[in-house]
Regions:
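Membrane-proximal intracellular helices of multi-pass ion channels
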Residues: 2-185
Length: 185
């Protein structure tokens, strides 16, 4: 039994450190200094929301940085065993996990609805702008990372209610996210 636990710990460490390394490198390539890249990456993988800047990720005002962190937060909120299965070519991977498909579907649908609310509510003048900020905030809250890129206090009630709703549902069991978990719905 101890060999099984040792193997599971190794897998968790491999996924956690691998995500942190890849995210750090990508953030550095996107223009951050090494300190900011490492701390934002560590926070995104841990889905803890700590930022070195008072304005959180909004400080960087970078689509590249936001995109990297969206991917990192999404991956960190998926069961690490499923991520490992995906990396090793096993059948029970991201594309075959029913929970992961549900989770990613929730993210996609809520992002589109929030973006529509922002665009038609006149908060952002372009669909691209509405999608940019909606995607980041939805992923940040459903993953329980808590990063911010926008002042959501000026967002329409529909967007706020959806953001609160996804922050309750959260990510998948076996990930770094907090909350109830998608698996239980």
């Amino acid at each position: 039994a101890s060999d099984v636990y040792k193997r599971q710990a190794q897998i968790l460490l491999f996924i956690y450190l691998g995500l942190t390394f890849c995210s750090t490198l990508a953030l550095k390539l996107a223009g951050m200094n090494w300190f900011d890249a490492l701390t934002q990456a560590m926070s995104a993988v841990a889905t803890s929301g700590f930022s070195t800047k008072n304005a959180s990720i909004g400080y960087f005002d970078s689509v590249a940085v936001e995109s990297i962190l969206i991917v990192t937060m999404l991956l960190a909120s998926i069961h690490f065993g499923v991520l490992f299965a995906t990396l090793t070519g096993r059948r029970n991977n991201i594309f075959h996990s029913e929970v992961t498909r549900w989770y990613l579907s929730i993210v996609a649908v809520v992002t589109v609805v929030v973006a529509g609310s922002l665009y038609f509510g006149g908060v952002y003048g372009t669909v691209a702008g509405a999608l940019r900020y909606a995607a980041f905030q939805v992923v940040s809250l459903i993953s329980t990372a808590g990063f911010a890129t926008a002042d959501t206090t000026v967002w329409p009630a529909t967007a706020i209610v959806l953001l609160i709703s996804v922050s309750i549902v959260c990510g998948c069991a076996g990930s770094t996210t907090g909350g109830i978990k998608t698996d239980r719905f």
